[in-house]
């Protein structure tokens, strides 16, 4: 099963120009079996996803509610952005990553570092958790991302392999053309958030493309 697990729409993410009504059509056209909607700090309500599937006539298509959470330490230091799956509420974007991990794991969900080694456009460092990926109690990380140069791919794969974490490939799409640019191929069917969390924990990934 091929899923793109990092997509933003303009319903809840002001930085995206993807209309919700077009996201599934474009995902289908890209050959995907499913997607995750990961708005900034906001989890799509289940009823809204059900309505979206009904209106588009795509009830058999997999749409998973996740969110992308920006985290900050108690001192206000940016700690990176993280994809959350399996948590029933919107988390916002103000908590420390340690608290987010505690909350999400308490609900049986998973936390995946989003673009941990995405270089900043100016200066040094990363627009992600960077080397903290070696120590945080995360369940996985993005090993392929449109903004990764080759060095970032190598760093992400090194963390994945040495820590035994799940590695996923995501488009981080903010426009229709980006959907499915990168996707994760799962060994078994992933029909909902619970199955996704289980697959991440067991690293049931066949390939990242």
Labelled PLM ranges:
Residues 110-121:
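Aromatic-lined carbohydrate-recognition surfaces of secreted/lumenal glycan-active proteins
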Residues 63-69:
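Two-metal-ion RNase H-like nuclease active-site motif
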Residues 52-56:
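Alpha-helical transmembrane segments and their immediate juxtamembrane cytosolic regions
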Residues 1-9, 13, 19-26, 46, ...:
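Charged catalytic cores and adjacent phosphate/nucleic-acid-binding surfaces used
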Residues 1, 31-34, 59-63, 107-110, ...:
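Short, well-ordered coil/turn segments that N-cap beta-strands
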Residues 40, 68, 116, 173:
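Short, ordered loop/turn segments at secondary-structure junctions
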Residues 4, 8, 24-44, 64, ...:
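Divalent metal-dependent hydrolysis catalytic cores, especially in the metallo-beta-lactamase
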């Amino acid at each position: 099963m091929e899923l793109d697990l990092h997509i933003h729409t303009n319903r809840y993410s002001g930085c995206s120009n993807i209309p919700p009504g077009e996201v599934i059509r474009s995902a289908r056209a890209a050959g995907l079996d499913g997607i995750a909607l990961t708005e900034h700090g906001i989890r799509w309500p289940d009823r809204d996803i059900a309505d979206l599937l009904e209106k588009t006539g795509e009830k058999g298509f997999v749409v998973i509610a996740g969110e992308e959470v920006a985290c900050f330490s108690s001192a206000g230091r940016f700690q990176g952005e993280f994809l959350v799956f399996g948590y029933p509420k919107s988390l916002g974007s103000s908590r420390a990553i340690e608290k987010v991990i505690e909350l999400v794991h308490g609900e049986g969900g998973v936390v995946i570092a989003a673009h941990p080694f995405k270089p900043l456009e100016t200066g040094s460092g990363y627009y992600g958790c960077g080397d903290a990926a070696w120590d945080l109690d995360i369940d996985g990380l993005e090993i392929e991302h449109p903004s990764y140069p080759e060095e970032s791919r190598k760093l992400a794969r090194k963390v994945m392999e040495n820590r035994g974490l799940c590695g996923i490939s995501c488009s981080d799409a903010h426009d229709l053309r980006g959907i499915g640019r990168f996707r994760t191929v799962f060994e078994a069917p992933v029909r909902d958030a619970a199955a996704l969390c289980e697959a991440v924990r067991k690293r049931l990934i066949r390939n990242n493309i």
